[in-house]
Amino acid sequence: MSIEERVKKIIVEQLGVKEDDVKPEASFIEDLGADSLDTVELVMALEEEFDIEIPDEEAEKITTVQSAIDYVQNNQ
């Protein structure tokens, strides 16, 4: 499974959204209905899945599906 597919799978599981709604430009809060706690849990799930550390200042910048994919790809 590609990084993109794994990130999308985590988003679907964490936010309880349909896979069809997880588009690259989708904002976690505005488009996918996440709140700030959801986004923290999402970052924690990404850290666990990809065995990476995401500092708070970087986590704040991860606001869309594509930004999550890009971050993981650049920090693997």
From Swiss-Prot:
Metabolic or biological pathway, per its Swiss-Prot or TrEMBL entry: Lipid metabolism; fatty acid biosynthesis
Biological-process GO terms, alphabetical: lipid A biosynthetic process
**Which ranges carry the Carrier domain?**
1-76
Q: What GO cellular-component annotations does this UniProt entry give?
A: cytosol; membrane
Q: Which UniProt keywords apply?
A: Cytoplasm, Fatty acid biosynthesis, Fatty acid metabolism, Lipid biosynthesis, Lipid metabolism, Phosphopantetheine, Phosphoprotein
Zinc as a keyword? no
GO function term, MF aspect, one: acyl carrier activity
Q: Where in the cell is the protein located? A: Cytoplasm
Q: Pfam families, per this entry?
A: PP-binding
Main subcellular localization, coarse class? cytoplasm
Database matches in InterPro entries: ACP, ACP-like_sf, PP-bd_ACP, Ppantetheine_attach_site
Post-translational modifications reported in the UniProt record: 4'-phosphopantetheine is transferred from CoA to a specific serine of apo-ACP by AcpS. This modification is essential for activity because fatty acids are bound in thioester linkage to the sulfhydryl of the prosthetic group.
Sequence positions bearing O-(pantetheine 4'-phosphoryl)serine: S36
Which family does the UniProt entry place this protein in? Belongs to the acyl carrier protein (ACP) family.
Q: What does this protein do?
A: Carrier of the growing fatty acid chain in fatty acid biosynthesis.
Against NCBIfam families, the record matches this protein to: acyl_carrier (TIGR00517), PRK00982.1-2 (NF002148), PRK00982.1-3 (NF002149), PRK00982.1-4 (NF002150), PRK00982.1-5 (NF002151)
Q: Which protein is depicted?
A: Acyl carrier protein
